[in-house]
Amino acid sequence: MRKDVRIVLAGDPDVGKSTLITSLVKEAYVAKVQKVVPPITLPPEVAPEAVVTKIVDTSSSPEHRANLEAELRRANVICIVYSISAPSSFDRIPTYWLPYIRSLGVNVPVILVGNKIDLRSGDVTNAALEDELAPVMAEFKEVETCVECSARIPLNVSEVFYFAQKAVLYPTAPLYDSREHVLKPACVDALKRIFRLCDSDKDGLLSDGELNDFQRKCFDTPLQAQELEGIKDLVVQAPIAGLRYNHENSSVAASGSSANGDIPSHHPHLREGSLTMAGFLYLHTLFIQRGRLETTWTVLRTFGYGVDLSLQDSFVKPAFAVPPECSVELSPNGYQFLTDIFEVHDKDRDGALSEEELDSLFITAPDNRHPWQGTGFPTSTITDEHGAVTLQGWLAQWSMTTLLDHRTTLAYLAYLGYPSFPLSGSSGSASTPAPIPLTPTGPPGSRPSRNRTPCPPSTITALKLTRPRKTDKKKKGAIQRSVFLGFVLGAAGSGKTAILRNMVGKRFANAYEPTQKMMSVVSTVEQAGAERYLVLQEFGSRYEAEVLRNTAKLSAADVIVFVYDSSDTNSFSYISNLRQQYPLLQSMPSLFVATKADLDLAQQRHEVQPDTYCRKLGLKIPGLGAGPLNISIRDGQSADLYGLICTIAVDPKGAVQGGYDRNALSYGTNRWQFWGYIGLVVIGGGGAVWICAKVLKVPIGSTLGFGSSASTTSWWLSGAQARGAGGPNATKVSSWFDWIRWQSSSNVRSEL
């Protein structure tokens, strides 16, 4: 919102520019004034929207031309003053002043000020004035209005500057086509969206209650009964197709229908006693035509629109910082709002949103589309047998969106009208300035009460931050969150997609189709008597490496689900190699899953079999042990896979290689042992390594290489890669370094 307004007065000599400014300041007529008065500043208390106003006088003499041009370029609004007693000063406005301003490249509102009205001889009708001004306003669209005044009487002096302020704070040009006398398309689109958001029951009408909610939201006060009646009388009396409906002694508000003969049932502005969208647009057209632009602008700004009639970034993209180790979830307010809009758009009351109902729900969003284009929605969440999104699936989908990209959730909460009227309530107080009346009462151009435009409500109240994982670990090891993220990794054809589809209740697909793009699904899972939302993601061969190389993305996962085909001899080697290639995987909570248990078990081509591998990692998962978990999606045997993933996410200690605190080993009691082994290798070479092997009774050929920490593993791995060109000896050294690093972990059992 603008904080200041700069008004520049221009015009021919002796038209009274300086006298007008002096009369405003002195609040009285001053006969002798300076030719050019210094700039004055009006405090925010005397201006709409509490802005600071600077008024600048200028001279039209040739010697001051440079200063005149500089001030015109700095102006937010220009008042061209002419003298009613000197008709030539008015004639020069369209022939000199307006073309001259355009030649400077200045595009700001212009107010025409007819001064010295006290010197006019005879009466002039409004029609005559309009005829005189119409050609000028038709040719020069920057002309907002014309005000006649007198500094001597005085008359309308403060109104001159008030209308100048209004021209900046509530501009006409973005809203109204003064040549065609219609609302501009962007304004129509914005007002239609606002109408739909205020139509709480989605019946295409604004009832008395909805109009009152709208009034409270925008102006912080309810409508009185007579004001409601006045609105309806006003919109019904508009000429429609050449016909004008008169109601004389009848009350539109009381009639409500055509039964009493007062209102034709086909009237486009009012139906069944409620305001239609056409009536809503007509009402705002009247506001603008009668000089009440502040009313329409207040409505637009309340719903987040800026001067360009697009939703402001501060509304759609509010600041919401997410500290490390924290995640974002919907707050109770957010879940309530999403539940409310689900229920109001579920027109057939079948507990699910069909495609048509979803289209209706997102009609207030950009391009009338939901944010999940190209993601497989609604198959990514829970649907009924017809593919319609259930309430459970709807809330789950938004929980996933908030977890993965909370900015999208914030934007769509704004598009969908968060908060709803029941959530926002009335925030009025005795100290709130008087609002602008919704009905445009009073003569055109009359001055309404000043007010501050309310800001749109912040959408961040619909979200909440979770506690950092480290904080949760200190508090009895349990993570206090309700939405968890799991990455599903494994070789092609191992059954990852089947696991994801099964979680959201989709049928098993016999035909194999390789995953070409990232796939995300979400569902509710019962875990320890609580309902959790579990998000599972599969990346496909094209994107898997990209995600695993990105530390930030990988660290966002709560659980890594390693999937292998128990009937394929090469399947387990893929995930074993993956863990060695991306060492950070070794430090993350993990669950190993053997799929296709309905097929014959195959011996895996790997140094050790999967069950031995899991035991040697030191995994102790509640209800499973080390693993792996054997399942068959084809036979419907999932063995509480999803509940187990949530259990690990809540308390990951037993699912991490060697225990949850192994990252601290370099700073614990084994630090001396770790560096001692390093010294032995450096000083004694191969002999020292042989001694270590004898003392610790570990086979010299051991190449298991289970890393003790992500940082240590990464360091040794980079060294091994650097020595890779050195032939077979380099490979052996890398293996010995891996062995020493592995031995330094206090959590790896001696049976390895």
UniProtKB/Swiss-Prot annotation:
Domain Miro: 2-170, 481-651
Mitochondrial intermembrane side stretches: 693-752
Cellular component per GO, a single term: mitochondrial outer membrane
EC number: 3.6.5.-
UniProt keyword list: Calcium, GTP-binding, Hydrolase, Membrane, Metal-binding, Mitochondrion, Mitochondrion outer membrane, Nucleotide-binding, Repeat, Transmembrane, Transmembrane helix
InterPro entries given in the database record: EF-hand-dom_pair (IPR011992), EF_Hand_1_Ca_BS (IPR018247), EF_hand_assoc_1 (IPR013566), EF_hand_assoc_2 (IPR013567), EF_hand_dom (IPR002048), Miro-EF-hand_domain (IPR052266), MIRO_dom (IPR020860), P-loop_NTPase (IPR027417)
GO terms (BP aspect): heme transport; mitochondrion inheritance; mitochondrion organization; mitochondrion-endoplasmic reticulum membrane tethering; phospholipid homeostasis; regulation of mitochondrion organization
Limits of the EF-hand domain: 186-221, 333-368
PROSITE patterns assigned to the protein according to its UniProt record, in alphabetical order: EF_HAND_1 (PS00018), EF_HAND_2 (PS50222), MIRO (PS51423)
Spans annotated as Disordered: 426-460
Domain of life per record: Eukaryota
Compositionally biased intervals (Pro residues): 434-446
Residues bound to Ca(2+) 1: 199, 201, 203, 210
Binding site for GTP 1: 11-18, 57-61, 115-118
Keyword DNA repair attached: no
Residues that bind Ca(2+) 2: 346, 348, 350, 357
Pfam family, one: EF_assoc_2
Residues passing through the membrane, by range: 672-692
SUPFAM superfamilies: EF-hand, P-loop containing nucleoside triphosphate hydrolases
Chief location bin: mitochondrion
Localization in the cell: Mitochondrion outer membrane
Cytoplasmic side: 1-671
General function of this protein: Mitochondrial GTPase involved in mitochondrial trafficking. Probably involved in control of anterograde transport of mitochondria and their subcellular distribution.
Annotated family: Belongs to the mitochondrial Rho GTPase family.
Name of the protein described by the UniProt record: Mitochondrial Rho GTPase 1
Species of the source: Mycosarcoma maydis
Lineage of the organism: Eukaryota, Fungi, Dikarya, Basidiomycota, Ustilaginomycotina
Gene assigned in the entry: GEM1
